[in-house]
Design a protein with these regions (language model features):
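Conserved glycine-rich beta-strand-loop-beta hairpin in the small C-terminal domain of fold type I
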Residues: 16-24, 36-48
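Hydrophobic C-terminal alpha-helix "anchor/cap" residues
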Residues: 27-28, 63
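Short beta-strand-to-loop capping motifs
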Residues: 47-51, 89-91
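Single conserved hydrophobic/aromatic residue that forms the stacking wall/gate
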Residues: 1-9
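A short, small/polar-residue-rich loop/turn motif at beta-strand boundaries
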Residues: 55-61
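Short amphipathic alpha-helical/adjacent loop interface patches that line ligand
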Residues: 13, 20, 100
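PLP-dependent enzyme catalytic core of the Aspartate aminotransferase-like
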Residues: 62-71, 77-110
Length: 110
């Protein structure tokens, strides 16, 4: 099961800020090897997985096959995006929690 956000869903700013704080705390506490590139004026985070030493293809395989989540591959934005994935935090908190928990489980054995 892969989670996505319907085109008709919308979040108030307070929800977006709560989601941002949740992602920051989750990564710091549970996945400190994943660095967060803070967005400027957007609800899309760049997650830096380079510390795992995976190729762009390996990173996508772990995310989609092991974690069952679909993130935008950073490599789609050029070679400088290799090792990164883009996370949309403009979704309900339950989806964000589920997705990050799946990513955590997939990466804890790497």
């Amino acid at each position: 099961e892969i989670y996505t956000l319907s085109l008709h869903d919308a979040l108030p700013i307070s929800s977006w800020e709560r989601n941002r704080s949740f992602v920051e705390a989750f990564l710091l506490e549970r996945m400190p090897r994943v660095k967060l590139k803070h967005p400027q004026g957007t609800f899309i985070f760049w997650l830096d997985f380079r510390d795992y030493g995976l190729s762009a293809q390996e990173l996508q395989r772990v995310l989609t096959e092991k974690a069952g989540v679909a993130l935008n591959p950073g490599i789609s934005f050029g070679r400088q995006g290799e090792g990164f994935a883009r996370l949309n935090i403009g979704c309900p908190m339950a989806q964000l929690e589920e997705g990050l928990s799946r990513i955590f489980k997939a990466f804890e054995t790497l």
